[in-house]
């Protein structure tokens, strides 16, 4: 798909949901949202910069923030006013695995499997690395943390080399020092992730330089 076609389809999904508040099921909204994110990944988006007031993350959690995933207001409002689906949460959740339609289990091995599956679904390449290592593939780093049996957390490296995170859905965006333990969370792994457009830019640079 070309850039203009992607923008048109993204806009259509938002308009469709905005015009059909209360008429769309939660299951259909999640299906549209997954499609939205996969298309969004094809846009010319650079590696992240720190901006504590970025509206892109207003309806998202730490996972959305780490992967730079938007949650447009139309999706959020449609979900909160959707036709009832008893097998889905009442609030719009972004658990690890939701993009690849996998159930989230709060075990490190399951979280890792789900994370890899989500990244694969979005066309994002990932390379295991360390917090202090340089990025060898043109991407940026994310780190997964885990509080045993209770919760997960993500932080990300911004383009200035510093790290930041968002604590849950209502938390603010803040700087954070990466370490083996953050608050009550223990480090599970760190990946350098490379999105489709970054790979495209790197290929172009390699050919033209």
Please annotate each region the language model reported.
Residues 161-209:
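Active-site or metal-binding loop neighborhoods of secreted/extracellular toxin and effector enzymes
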Residues 2-13, 32:
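Short amphipathic alpha-helical heptad-repeat segments
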Residues 95-170:
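...with weaker cross-activation on analogous glycine-rich loops/strands in unrelated enzymes
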Residues 54-72, 104-112, 151:
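Active-site nucleophilic cysteine motif
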């Amino acid at each position: 798909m070309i850039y203009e076609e992607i923008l048109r389809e993204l806009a259509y999904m938002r308009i469709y949901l905005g015009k059909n508040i209360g008429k769309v099921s939660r299951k259909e909204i999640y299906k549209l949202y997954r499609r939205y994110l996969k298309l969004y990944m094809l846009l010319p988006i650079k590696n992240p910069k720190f901006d504590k007031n970025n509206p892109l993350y207003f309806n998202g959690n730490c996972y959305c923030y780490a992967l730079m995933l938007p949650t447009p207001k139309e999706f959020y409002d449609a979900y909160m006013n959707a036709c009832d689906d008893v097998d889905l949460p009442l609030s719009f959740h972004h658990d690890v695995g939701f993009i690849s339609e996998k159930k989230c289990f709060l075990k490190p091995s399951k979280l890792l499997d789900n994370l890899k599956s989500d990244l694969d679904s979005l066309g994002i390449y990932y390379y295991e690395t360390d917090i202090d290592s340089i990025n060898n593939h043109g991407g940026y780093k994310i780190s997964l943390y885990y509080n045993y049996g209770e919760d997960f957390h993500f932080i990300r490296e911004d383009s200035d080399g510093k790290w930041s995170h968002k604590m849950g859905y209502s938390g603010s965006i803040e700087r954070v020092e990466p370490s083996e333990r953050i608050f009550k969370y223990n480090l599970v792994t760190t990946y350098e992730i490379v999105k489709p457009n970054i790979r495209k830019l790197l290929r172009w640079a390699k050919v033209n330089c």
